[in-house]
Amino acid sequence: MTIPLTLKQRATGAQPRAMRREGRIPAVLYGHRGTQSLALELEQRTAEDLLKRVTINNTILPLKVERGWSGDVLLREVQHDAVGGKLLHLSFFAVAGHGSITLDLPLVFTGEAVGVKMDGGLLEKVLTQLTVNTPPTDVPEAIEVDISTMQVGDMLYVKDLVLPPGIEVVNTPDLVVAHLTPSPTGRALQSMDAAESAVEQPGEQPATAAG
């Protein structure tokens, strides 16, 4: 996704509260020229429009600083007022010059599980995104998760996922991604079958009195 974004360098001594009263949002760029950070600002309307189009810690976008640096960045953090929800601050991270970056990628489930199609099972998606390390020059939009072979009772773990080349998962390998459970009707039938099996089990015959 290409989202041109131009920010101004923040004036020395500018007070964030005063800026917000004037319709400007303070921001900061990290990873710019090593560990140096750069104080920035942008119009509130521009910031709010940006937040409608990008995902925190996921979308890489081009950023240009007026009369200064330009390059690709991640939107790392968004701060809102805890009471009123007012936008307070944005943090960006420059990805250029880094061998890999850490970000969150959404999971896209593909196929129809056999256990759903044949047995009426219910698929529960436990995980909706993965935290990964990836080269900044080749970031996939999402991680595809093929669920077509899942049967009722199956559980899919992070370690089972097929990842694009160069992607390294940060999440715990044994974290559950999805599992397939019987439908309520299926569970009821299983309970009935179990009860019938218990009744049909041959029990010990009572002893008869001699006489």
Curated annotation (Swiss-Prot):
Keywords: Ribonucleoprotein, Ribosomal protein, RNA-binding, rRNA-binding. This is Large ribosomal subunit protein bL25. This is one of the proteins that binds to the 5S RNA in the ribosome where it forms part of the central protuberance. CDD domains: Ribosomal_L25_TL5_CTC. It comes from Gloeobacter violaceus (strain ATCC 29082 / PCC 7421). Part of the 50S ribosomal subunit; part of the 5S rRNA/L5/L18/L25 subcomplex. Contacts the 5S rRNA. Binds to the 5S rRNA independently of L5 and L18. GO terms for biological process: translation. It comes from the Bacteria. The gene is rplY.
